C-alpha cells in the first residue's frame, strides 16, 4: 500500500464526529477537535468489513482496493460467503438518519461478536460519511489500545465551517513522547 489513504485521516474524523459537519451543508460555526496520532507497537489482528460490492465508485482508496482484491481472491467462488459479506457490509455502510441510532443495532451486535466472541482485536470498515472514498474507520478493543498502541501526539484543532466550505487549523500539538507542546 502506498499509504495515500493516511492523508485523509483528519477528513474522516471530522466527517464522522463533528457536530457542525453532521448538521448539514448549511451549518455555520466553529468547533474544537482533538486528533491523536498513535504508533502500533505490536501487530493487531484486524477483521475488515468488505464485500464484492463494497463502494464500487471509490477510486482513490488503495487500502480498500487491496482488501477487496484479497477478499475476492479467497471467496469469489463461494456464493454463501459473498451473500453474507454483502449483508454485513451493507449494515456497516448504511447511512443512518439523525435520531434513528437504533438502525446501528445490527452492526453494533456484529462488531461486538467479532471483537468479544471471535476475539478479533479490531474491526475496520469504510467511512460511511465519505462513501468509502477517503479511508477506513477502526474500532479497537480498549485492552488492545492499551497494550499494542503508543500515543505519540495530540493535535488541538479548530474546525471553521461556513455552509459548504470548511477549514481545519491546527492550534497546537502536544508531543507526548517528549512532554512538550
Give the ranges of each region predicted by the language model:
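A short, exposed loop/beta-hairpin motif centered on an aromatic-Gly-Thr core
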Residues: 1-7
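Active-site and NAD+-binding cores of ADP-ribose-processing enzymes
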Residues: 20-181
